[in-house]
Amino acid sequence: MSDQEFDLSKIRNIGIMAHIDAGKTTTTERILYYAGRTHKIGEVHEGGATMDWMEQEQERGITITSAATTVFWLDCKINIIDTPGHVDFTIEVERSLRVLDGAVAVFDAVSGVEPQSETVWRQANKYGVPRIAFVNKMDRMGANYFAAVESMKEKLGANAIPVHCPIGAESQFVGMVDLISQKALYFLDETLGAKWEEREIPEDLKEKCAELRYALLEELATVDEGNEAFMMKVLEDPDSITEEEIHQVMRKGVIENKINPVLCGTAFKNKGVQQLLNVIVKWLPSPKDRGIIHGINLKNNEEVHLEPRKDGPLAALAFKIMTDPYVGRITFIRIYSGTLKKGSAILNSTKDKKERISRLLEMHANERTDRDEFTVGDIGACVGLKYSVTGDTLCDDNQEIVLERIEIPEPVIDMAIEPKSKGDREKLAQALNALSEEDPTFRVTSNEETGQTIISGMGELHLDILRDRMIREFKVEANVGKPQVSYKETITKNGSSETKYVKQSGGRGQYAHVCLEIEPNEPGKGNEVVSKIVGGVIPREYIPAVMKGVEEGLNTGVLAGYGLVDVKVSIVFGSYHEVDSSEMAFKICGSMAVKEACRKAAPVILEPIMKVAVTTPEDHLGDVIGDLNRRRGKILGQESSRSMAQVNAEVPLSEMFGYTTSLRSLTSGRATSTMEPAFFAKVPQKIQEEIVKK
């Protein structure tokens, strides 16, 4: 085996993902501690967690940005990304999962699967990321490992298989039986759970563990269908199966996404974290196991298949931008093929711009170490890239490849923002520009009619935190308006326009003539502008100007000035004047033409619909459902467990402002709710008329 193959098989790129407060960051902190990366364990509730390095995170005790770090365990190098669990920061989860090879999903032993766990799980399904699960907080009142496993099967459709059987629960949780080695692991309290001893399985658990182990083996046999020898052993002599054989089949099942093994522990009390580290190495895939990478060759538009090789052509994905007061702009990248050296010149193939790398950094939360090169499988950061943003591909000059992009959701909430003093105007513009580069779900636009600057994001907390960062990092004070719904506009039928822009005011005039056809695009696909000009009726050098004009025209809608989405525009015909035509004339004409076409294409206003989950005592269930119905909500279903009910609904965001407060008074403070963007839908006609009047 060559050095390169050996190295690659020893790398694990993993994410730690979960619902807010399931104990994700604490689990990561313990991993860093045991793998010798930190000498003192950081506690989230003390504001000392290494991975939560932004001041806002330490104050609020939640994780906002995905911090990246590298640790070593059992001769493997593990790159870990700790992702946020709060729904306003889903882009952080989305972009992390896009570059990971495997993930650990952390669940709370009391709550099991919570709404945000479902979102994160769906995102991981989309990118086909293999997962193992860790049921955390086994020492809490009401902890129930097997109920958590069942909720994973029911709510996530996961093939969740217990590999542990807890010994005791709540304050009596002392260890677990490892169903693979058939040993009971007891944590030694005087070592704070850092050490344990192996003993025989307790008498009262022997029968249950034997059943669980047989169920595990049966499941593995069905997952690895082609392995007849394993199947025969399970049927005829399950006790003869070795640990090694089980690990091999388990690894194959996890990598193929057919099985999700579930471990248990309590990270805060240090129980079960080393066992988790062992299986991260044993079961989760290396970059080599994820196999061939698919991209598009820009020269001939054909699909390219790249093997993860050190000496292959360079293909890397920028998945996060960070601004550092000392170093400047830092771009986080994942290398899928080839090697990237410090000082090298590369191509951003998404933007067709040349870039130069001045420094390469290995990150540990916000500490950094300089490196001379990164190679296939590495996750690291580079300094010196000017144009690259989230989702861009970096490659060799002569190998123009574009990798699959990261899906970026549309923002759902708007706020007007202005500097407190005239002197802050420039600083505010710089801050907004830097923050929108870092976070693709944060948009900055200006309202043409009022001249106001509008910031848009994924929720109130999202915009709150960005405002905090402006004050702290950019020293800029700003006034913000009340949160407003971020409406969009779209068209519902085909339309066309023929527009001439002619100006004659002595001397050289202006002339442009553009014909467009527009049609609705698939929901969520965004706007597309294509040129179908043939025979040079509009010269080639003017076509980019027409496209730019069309794109700018789509930024403000024709009903109420909200941006148009999901519109497909084709430039089909036009004409020009030898002397009077210019790029400016064609740009203005493109913008006018698309507006005219949209007016004829039955435009409508869209509003963000939120997926809402309310957990309430059953005696308040009727009130909660009635209230959601009054808010134009559509009830999707409800489920009950232990005198509590969970109601799932889809409700327009415009009806949900201040919902937490009214839910509290409706249920005497006993109900809780979560909310996340689901999709955009057409606004009812009556409400559309009110919005247009405003």
UniProtKB/Swiss-Prot annotation:
Pfam families: EFG_C, EFG_III, EFG_IV, GTP_EFTU, GTP_EFTU_D2
Chief place where the protein resides: cytoplasm
Subcellular location: Cytoplasm
A cellular-component GO term for this protein: cytoplasm
Protein's GO biological process: ribosome disassembly
Chain positions recorded as GTP binding sites: 18-25, 82-86, 136-139
GO molecular function, one term: GTPase activity
Keywords: Cytoplasm, Elongation factor, GTP-binding, Nucleotide-binding, Protein biosynthesis
Domain tr-type G: 9-288
SMART domains: EFG_C, EFG_IV
Function: Catalyzes the GTP-dependent ribosomal translocation step during translation elongation. During this step, the ribosome changes from the pre-translocational (PRE) to the post-translocational (POST) state as the newly formed A-site-bound peptidyl-tRNA and P-site-bound deacylated tRNA move to the P and E sites, respectively. Catalyzes the coordinated movement of the two tRNA molecules, the mRNA and conformational changes in the ribosome.
Family listed: Belongs to the TRAFAC class translation factor GTPase superfamily. Classic translation factor GTPase family. EF-G/EF-2 subfamily.
PANTHER family (UniProt xref): RIBOSOME-RELEASING FACTOR 2, MITOCHONDRIAL, TRANSLATION ELONGATION FACTOR G-RELATED
Protein name as catalogued: Elongation factor G
Provenance organism: Chlamydia caviae (strain ATCC VR-813 / DSM 19441 / 03DC25 / GPIC)
